[in-house]
Design a protein with these regions (language model features):
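Active-site-flanking segments in enzyme catalytic domains
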Residues: 2-154
Length: 154
C-alpha cells in the first residue's frame, strides 16, 4: 500500500517519475536503486526478449504469489543456502520485484554472498544482458555498477 511504500515510480507519457520516502536515511540508496530498477525493467521488457522465460530460472514448483501479504513460509528454503533463489520474501511476490531486489543488491556494497548462488548469478546475468540490450550498451567494455557481482561471462 502507499501508506507503507518507501518509494514508487511511474511513467506519464514520455516523462518518468520516482518518488522516495525512505523511513531511514540508510535505506535511501536501496530505495533509489529499487525504484530505478522498475523504470529500467519497463524498457528491457519493451525493447528486448531478455526476460522471456524468466520463470524458468525458478524451481518448477514455485509460483510468484502476486500478493504482497501472501504467506511464503512454504518457500522459506529458497532464501538460504548455496542454491538460494531469492533475496527475500518480497522478491517472491512478483517477477518485477524479484528483479528489482536483485538489481538493488547488485548496486550496493557487501552483497557478494548473495550472488554466490548459481541461480541468483543467472538472474543477475539475465538482468545485465537485458540492460545492455535495451540501452544499446552491448559493445561498451566497462563494467557497470550493477555488474560488480557478475561472475559469468557476458
Amino acid at each position: 500500500s502507499l501508506d507503507s511504500a518507501e518509494g514508487l515510480q511511474f511513467q506519464n507519457g514520455s516523462h518518468f517519475y520516482i518518488a522516495l520516502a525512505p523511513k531511514e536515511e540508510d535505506s535511501l540508496k536501496h530505495t533509489l536503486f529499487h525504484e530505478f530498477s522498475h523504470l529500467i525493467d519497463n524498457r528491457v521488457l519493451t525493447k528486448t526478449g531478455a526476460y522471456d522465460n524468466w520463470n524458468d530460472l525458478n524451481p518448477q514448483d514455485f509460483a510468484y504469489s502476486l500478493d504482497l501479504n501472501a504467506d511464503m513460509t512454504p518457500y522459506k528454503a529458497l532464501l538460504t543456502g548455496p542454491d538460494r533463489v531469492f533475496i527475500d520474501n518480497y522478491a517472491m511476490t512478483f517477477p518485477a520485484e524479484d528483479r528489482a531486489r536483485i538489481f538493488e543488491c547488485a548496486c550496493t556494497p557487501g552483497n557478494e554472498e548473495d550472488f554466490a548462488s548459481p541461480i541468483l548469478q543467472a538472474k543477475l546475468q539475465r538482468i545485465c544482458t537485458g540492460i545492455r540490450q535495451a540501452f544499446d550498451l552491448e559493445d561498451v567494455p566497462e563494467r557497470f555498477l550493477w555488474e560488480q557481482y557478475l561472475t559469468l561471462t557476458q
